[in-house]
Structures are given as C-alpha cells and as structure tokens.
C-alpha cells in the first residue's frame, strides 16, 4: 500500500486583525470545497509559537501523490473555488505569504485520522521538524525512532499522530512529527519524563556512534486547533 502524503501550508499574516477574516474564509468557503473534492483529513490551526507569527497552519492529507494531483485538478476546475479565491483576495489581502511543503509518511507513522464525534479537543499540538545533514543520516534517524524512541515516547505520555519526511520544501532532508497534548503542563511533564529516561540517553548515544550528529537543527511550532479543524 502506498504511503500517505501530506501538504503542510503556513499562511503568514502581517497583522493580527487579518486572522478573523482568514479563519472565516477557511471555514465557510474553503473547507466545503475541500470536502466536495474529496480531500482527506484536514487540520487547521493557529500558530502560537513558531518562526512566523501571526500565522495559520493547515494540513491536507492524500492517499497518494497521484490523488493529491487529482484533487487539486478538480479544485482548480471548480468555478466556485475561483470565486472563493477572488472573494478572499478582494480589497486588502488576508495574508502576505503562503509556504507549502509536501511530505510522505514514514513506514512507522500511524494514519492521521479525523476526530470522532464527541472526542475531546486537544488544547495544544506540537510540530517538531528534525533536519539531518544528509539523506543517509535521515535514515539513521528513522532507525532510531523505529528502534525504540517511539516506544519510549508512548511510555512518557507522548503520542505522535504522524511522522513524515519532507520531499518538497525547505531544509531537506528532514522529518516532521506532530504531537497532541491536553495542556502545556501535560507537555512539560511528558517531555521531562522522556528526557530523564536513561534508556533514551543510551539510545541517543548509540545513534551518534553509528551515524554522527544525525539531527543538526530542530524547529518547534506550537499549534492550537480551530473549532472547525477535523484534526483536533
């Protein structure tokens, strides 16, 4: 079975006052069109901490690269989509820059699923992006995660909902993973338990022995799901 693909979109705002207009458009105009043209699970978040704020972060999911191309072809041919974009771009712009990356799920990633009716909304998501110096060293990073790090995550109360490699986008090679938390306190406690685990220290040392410094830079983003996000 082909690995799922993800589209990460960051919409950078120039002013905080643009946020309400952009979120309203995403909920009322864009989301129904995404659903009409059979896009997969979708997440929409405000960026609370990240390289660029204020910003809106979106995740679109596809079962394959071919289906991603087909979904956007259907969207681009829809006159309602053209009208919605024209409405958004009328008068003052709702954002000043769009950054898009395409990612492919790793072999050890769980499927990214929408929340079921009645599921509680997580207060916070953490997106972590690990940059490796080379593709070979990214492979060692995969080995470390699949070889024990994920199990240690779960024992510490850290439960990522996806792991994916960027195939089109900046700072490649890199791997991203997304973690839901009930609160900032939950996050701090879980990471403290993980960091203090001697097995983690041993696993990290072994990965460095095998592949050198396999992670050269880490980018963190704290995301808050919107009321209309399917991933919440």
State where each predicted segment sits:
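Short S/T/G/P-rich N-terminal loop/turn motif that feeds into the first structured element of a domain
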Residues: 1-232
């Amino acid at each position: 079975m082909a690995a799922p693909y993800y589209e990460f979109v960051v919409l950078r705002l120039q002013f905080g006052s643009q946020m309400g207009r952009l979120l309203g458009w995403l909920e009322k105009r864009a989301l129904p069109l995404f659903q009409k043209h059979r896009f997969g699970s979708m997440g929409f978040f405000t960026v609370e901490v990240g390289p660029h704020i204020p910003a809106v972060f979106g995740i679109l999911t596809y079962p394959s690269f071919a289906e991603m191309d087909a979904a956007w072809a259907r969207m681009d041919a829809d006159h309602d989509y053209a009208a919605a974009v024209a409405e958004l771009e009328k008068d003052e712009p709702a954002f000043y820059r769009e950054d898009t990356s395409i990612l492919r799920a790793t072999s050890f990633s769980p499927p990214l699923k929408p929340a079921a009716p009645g599921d509680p909304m997580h207060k916070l998501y953490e997106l972590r992006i690990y940059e490796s110096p080379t593709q070979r060293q990214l492979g060692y990073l995969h080995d470390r995660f699949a070889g024990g790090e994920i199990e240690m995550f779960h024992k510490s109360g850290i439960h990522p909902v996806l792991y994916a490699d960027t195939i089109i986008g900046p700072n490649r090679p890199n791997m991203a993973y997304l973690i839901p938390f009930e609160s900032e306190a939950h996050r701090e406690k879980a990471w403290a338990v993980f960091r203090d685990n001697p097995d983690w220290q041993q696993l990290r040392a072994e990965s460095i022995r095998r592949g050198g410094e396999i992670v050269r830079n880490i980018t963190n983003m704290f995301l808050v799901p919107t009321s209309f996000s399917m991933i919440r």
